[in-house]
C-alpha cells in the first residue's frame, strides 16, 4: 500500500494543532486542536473533514505526550491512526531554525540538538516544538519526522538585509541577526500569487503582507526572500496586535533609567501590551474598525499608526525589489479587512497600486485579485495555508529520500 498521508503538528506551549492531509490530492482528512494542556480544563476538538463531523472532549490532559496520545486515539476512531501504513511522515512546525536550516530537514539527534541550542533566541516557541517532536518520535519511532522552519524562507536574504549595524564580533557571539518569521506563510502566499497571475514563481516579484495578530511583510524576488520586516525576534517591523514593531532602541534604556522598569517588564510591555492593544485597548481589527466608524479618536489614531507603518514597508520593499508585480494580503486581517487593504494602498497610485472598491468589498474563500482591470501592479487577497505548505515540503523531502512505500 502506498504511503501518501502527512500528519502536520504545530506544538505550542500549551496547545497542539494538527491536520492529516492526503498528498495525492491535497484532501484534508482530519484536523483538530488540543488546548490548555496541563490544566484541568483541557479541551480536544477533532473534526473529520469530509463528513463535517466534529467531536469535543474536555478534561485534564497532563502534558504533550498525553495530548498526542489523545490525538492518535481520535484519529484511530476514524480509521486514520498513527499506525496506518498510509501515513508517510509527520511534519513539524518549528519556529526558529537560525541560520543553519534553510530547508525542510529530516529530524535526527543532531537536528534536535541544534533546535535546542536556538532556545535562547526563541524561548517561547522552540521548547514546545521540541516537546512535540520528541513525543511524536516516541509514538512512531520508525516514521520519518520532518522539521519545517518558520525562518527558513528568509535565509536567502543578502547579508546587507540580514545583518544589524553592530560590531560583528558581538553579533556572531550572541547570534544577533535578522532571521524573520512567518516564512512558511510567505513562501506559500508568494507562490500562490504567481499562480494567480498565471506566471512562474521565478518570474514574479511580490510584496507579501501577512497581517494577523502578529504581522510581517516580505519582499520576494523570483520566489526568494530578499527582505522581511521581523528580525532577531518577531517584535521588529509592523505594528501588530500587541507588539510595538519598529521603535527607537533607546526607549528601552529610557524606561530602565527614568521609569525604573526591569528588562522583563519592558519585554512584557513591548510584546504583550503595545501595538494596537497598547494604543487603544483593542487588538481585534473588527472592533477597532467599529470604533473608528463611531468616531472614536483612540481607535482612529491606532488605525492610522498601523496603516502608516504598513505603507512605509510597502514603499521600502518597492524600492528593494525595483519592480513589483503584485502586493498580496494574507492572514486574518489581510484576508478579511477590506478597510485595511484599501487604506494600505490609498495614495500609492503613483506606484501603480490601487484597489477596486467593489472587488475589495467581496468576501471569498479563494485567492482573488482586487485591483482594477489593467492595473500596473496586481493587488491580491491570497489566503494562507501553512499546514498545506508544511505537508507539501514534508512529503517532497521524504519522497526524495527514496522510501519505496511512497508514490
Swiss-Prot record:
Supply the EC number(s): 2.7.2.1
Q: Which domain of life is it from?
A: Bacteria
Active-site residues (renumbered): 150 (proton donor/acceptor)
Entry annotated with the keyword Metal-binding:
yes
Principal subcellular localisation of the protein? cytoplasm
- Residues the entry annotates as binding substrate: 93
The family database entries (Pfam families) matched by this protein are listed as: Acetate_kinase (PF00871)
Q: How does it assemble?
A: Homodimer.
Q: What does this protein do?
A: Catalyzes the formation of acetyl phosphate from acetate and ATP. Can also catalyze the reverse reaction.
Write down what this protein is called.
Answer: Acetate kinase
Supply the source organism for this entry.
Answer: Streptomyces coelicolor (strain ATCC BAA-471 / A3(2) / M145)
